[in-house]
């Protein structure tokens, strides 16, 4: 397990788990996890292994957790185990690939079932190194499994974005083969780019790999050729055609093992063009020996619209003489039956499979190997453990695929000219630099080339180490887990009525600020005009004009800062809705419009009885909350509302018969404040009976005297039982009382520096600290001071003082 960094507060872990294709080429399959979303990338087989051992390590991961499976292209090492995953595991996710990939997938895997030893069919030409292996029972899946999986596959267009349950992914051209794509994946703000196999080199029919317009955080890229550098395309083509030409003139035969689809079509285009330019070769046949390639040629003829500009212009030309399909060959024929193939003279055969494990290419190799006039040209990447890889060592003998006890002398020449549509080091490094990720995970490469590529990349970005731009490179092995801590910023969108209120508020603030700016600019301009009317030299006038401009710029900068202060830090209250990692802040009434959520109103009601009268109850409520709004007060009902949230009602007739007040308290449970306020009201009502204040308010002095007790007069005891006055001390705090409390706070902060203005009856005050003087107007609650720091400090104290001095609920203003 590789850990990039220890998880910290506010971070989520991104996890990469390689089930195949890590430190190897073949059976590509990778799992990425983030925020409980799981994506599988490719599902291939290893071309050098047989049966279940050729599969990725599916038993090491719970495939039922996978939400989406994305297939980059149709090659067997990326797609051949897909039917097995979909039909023989607990995988329940959705599968996506491009239209062209799906069109070829059906034919390719049908041929795979028949031809390989895994299929075990009657037509299979087997290459089983183990004579005791039970090929008939080693089927990974059947044709029926293949067709059922085919029906479940969904397609995606290039440059289109699909969003499913919080996962967004977009397909981009990857080059490599027809239909190949790289996926740009977004999960909860994290951006991941999976290149699959890709090519940045232009060829005859495919578009080069695209660079996505958005920078990914994590790049998962191939490392097939490590730090190797490709020979230029034109030089490769010239070298290949020269070898073919010279071999044919000597009477030899050329075998070109290829994958049935992909590079085969590119090589056929090269040969078709070369034959058209050389009349001496036009009587020599070119064959492509693959029933699969023949079936899929119609797909290539159909999907010319996703090929490069040259192909698209040729196929869409308005002039019928120029319009042609480049895949309708003139000099190339297909071989339908190898048993009837007559190979007595020189010829060129493009045959599959490319790894020479079995099939037509292996049979022709064994047939032509003893003749030194013949040649085999290896045009693709050769995987470890295959005949193609062994052949590059130029062995003296090769083993027969049909009879493992028989060896065949090898005298034909072997040439390696790689037309594999994979990036070399320069192309890979250039692409990485363009997308500029901070984390790179290398896949699809043998251990040594991958290790060299990792070292080269770390050396290239060594100057960034220890900085925020540091680039980290990982090269995990199969079944290794890479964990990367991702720290993201959560941003919520304000929608609906709440957004309209905020826009209105911002417009008002901006409009006010613009007016202030214009006034200041006009004042400065007027001052400048007054100065210019005086007789002065041109030099002095220019200087003052420049000073005026600087003053305006300075004031504009200050005003800009004030705007920032005004527009930030404002608290918003609403319902935060989270869906697919998107956060939206709404008011309750907007939920139905912007979400699929339904809303209900829950109203609480409680009945209680107290031994007191209405006036005493009202007095206690006013002492706590200040103002209470009386809705009804007649012979039958008394009702009030506290802070527009708590409704209290009393049925007077029922209360008289019950010997106390029967009180009904109701409130809507739509926020925490309402529930807290209701708890406070109920607590006050229940405590009225036993409150010492209630005893004092309702007690009377005796009308007679007690001789044995010294008669004393208690002011509290003199309070009559008549209802307390409407305007009690707390509910109707006088302005002077509030000013006194605010002044006390300022006094505690500034001491003797606080002076009350003479003759203003405490309505104004000044604070002098050093050279800075602040003038305070208590009635308007304004502070005038040339020091912003001092002014902000005083305003903050006044703001807190107002909150402390004011009751919870204010009296309604009357006009």
Swiss-Prot record:
Swiss-Prot/TrEMBL keywords: Endonuclease, Hydrolase, Metal-binding, mRNA processing, Nuclease, Nucleus, Zinc
Q: Which SUPFAM superfamilies match?
A: Metallo-hydrolase/oxidoreductase
What family does this belong to?
A: Belongs to the metallo-beta-lactamase superfamily. RNA-metabolizing metallo-beta-lactamase-like family. CPSF2/YSH1 subfamily.
Q: Describe the task this protein carries out.
A: Component of the cleavage factor I (CF I) involved in pre-mRNA 3'-end processing.
Chief place where the protein resides? nucleus
Note down the stretches annotated as region Disordered.
521-560
What name has this protein been given in UniProt?
Endoribonuclease YSH1
């Amino acid at each position: 397990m590789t850990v990039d960094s220890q998880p910290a507060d506010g971070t989520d872990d991104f996890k990469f788990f390689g089930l195949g294709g890590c430190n190897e080429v073949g059976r590509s399959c990778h799992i990425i996890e983030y925020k409980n979303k799981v994506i599988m990338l490719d599902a291939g087989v290893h071309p050098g292994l047989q049966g279940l051992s050729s599969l990725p390590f599916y038993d090491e991961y719970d495939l039922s957790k996978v939400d989406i499976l994305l297939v980059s292209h149709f090659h067997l090492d990326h797609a051949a185990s897909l039917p097995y995953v979909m039909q023989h595991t607990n995988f329940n996710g959705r599968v996506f690939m491009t239209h062209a990939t799906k069109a070829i997938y059906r034919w390719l895997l049908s041929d795979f079932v028949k031809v390989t030893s895994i299929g075990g069919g009657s037509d299979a030409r087997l290459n089983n190194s183990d004579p005791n292996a039970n090929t008939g029972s080693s089927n990974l899946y059947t044709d029926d499994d293949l067709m059922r999986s085919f029906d479940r596959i969904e397609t995606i267009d290039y440059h289109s974005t699909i969003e499913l349950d919080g996962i967004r992914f977009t397909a981009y051209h990857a080059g490599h083969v027809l239909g190949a794509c790289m996926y740009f994946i977004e999960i909860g703000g994290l951006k991941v780019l999976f290149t699959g196999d890709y090519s940045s080199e232009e060829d005859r029919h495919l578009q080069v790999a695209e660079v996505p317009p958005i920078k990914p955080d994590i790049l998962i890229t191939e490392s097939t050729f490590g730090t190797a550098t490709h020979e230029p395309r034109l030089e490769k083509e010239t070298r290949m055609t020269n070898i073919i030409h010279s071999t044919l003139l000597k009477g030899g035969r050329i075998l070109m093992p290829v994958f049935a689809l992909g590079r085969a079509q590119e090589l056929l285009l090269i040969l078709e063009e070369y034959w058209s330019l050389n009349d001496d070769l036009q009587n020599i046949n070119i064959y492509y020996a693959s029933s699969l390639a023949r079936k899929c040629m119609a797909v290539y003829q159909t999907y010319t619209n996703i090929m490069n500009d040259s192909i698209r212009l040729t196929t869409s030309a308005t002039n019928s003489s120029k319009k042609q399909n480049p895949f309708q060959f003139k000099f190339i024929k297909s071989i339908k039956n190898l048993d009837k193939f007559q190979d007595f003279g020189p010829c060129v055969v493009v045959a599959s499979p490319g790894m020479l494990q079995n099939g037509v290419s292996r049979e022709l190799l064994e047939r032509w190997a003893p003749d030194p006039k013949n040649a085999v040209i290896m045009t693709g990447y050769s995987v470890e453990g295959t005949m193609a890889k062994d052949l590059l060592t130029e062995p003296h003998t090769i083993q027969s695929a049909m009879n493992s006890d028989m060896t065949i002398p090898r005298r034909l020449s072997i040439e390696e000219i790689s037309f594999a549509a994979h990036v070399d080091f320069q192309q890979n490094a250039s692409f990485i630099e363009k997308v500029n990720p901070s984390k790179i995970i290398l896949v699809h490469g043998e251990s040594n080339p991958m290790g060299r590529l990792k070292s080269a990349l770390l050396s290239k970005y060594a100057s960034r180490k220890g900085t925020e731009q540091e680039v980290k490179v990982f090269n995990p092995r199969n079944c290794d887990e890479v964990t990367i801590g991702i720290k993201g910023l959560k941003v919520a969108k304000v929608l609906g009525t709440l957004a309209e209120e905020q826009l209105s508020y911002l417009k008002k603030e901006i409009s006010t600020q613009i007016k202030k700016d214009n006034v200041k600019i006009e004042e400065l301009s007027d001052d400048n005009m007054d100065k210019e009317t005086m007789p002065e030299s041109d030099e002095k006038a220019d200087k003052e004009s420049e000073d005026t401009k600087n003053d305006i710029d300075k004031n504009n900068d200050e005003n800009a800062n004030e705007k920032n202060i005004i527009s930030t830090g404002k608290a918003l209250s609403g319902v935060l809705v989270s869906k697919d990692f998107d956060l939206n802040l709404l008011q309750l009434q907007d939920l139905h419009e912007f979400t699929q959520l339904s809303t209900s109103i829950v109203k609480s009601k409680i009945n209680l009885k107290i031994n007191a009268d209405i006036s005493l109850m009202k007095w206690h409520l006013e002492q706590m909350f200040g103002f209470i709004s009386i809705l009804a007060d007649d012979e039958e009902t008394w009702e009030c509302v506290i802070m527009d949230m708590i409704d209290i009602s009393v049925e007077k007739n029922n209360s008289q018969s019950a010997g106390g007040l029967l009180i009904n308290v109701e409130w809507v449970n739509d926020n925490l404040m309402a529930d807290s306020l209701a708890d406070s009201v109920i607590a006050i009502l229940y405590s009225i009976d036993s409150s010492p204040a209630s005893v004092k308010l309702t007690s009377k002095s005796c009308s007679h005297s007690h001789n044995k007790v010294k008669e004393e007069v208690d002011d509290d005891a003199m309070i009559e039982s008549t209802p307390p006055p409407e305007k009690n001390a707390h509910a109707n705090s006088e302005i002077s009382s509030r000013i006194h409390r605010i002044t006390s706070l300022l006094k505690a902060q500034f001491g003797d520096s606080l002076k009350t203005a003479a003759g203003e009856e405490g309505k104004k005050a000044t604070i002098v600290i050093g050279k800075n003087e602040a003038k305070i107007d208590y009635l308007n609650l304004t502070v005038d001071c040339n020091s912003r720091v001092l002014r902000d400090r005083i305003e903050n104290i006044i703001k807190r003082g107002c909150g402390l001095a004011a009751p919870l609920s204010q009296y309604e203003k009357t006009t």
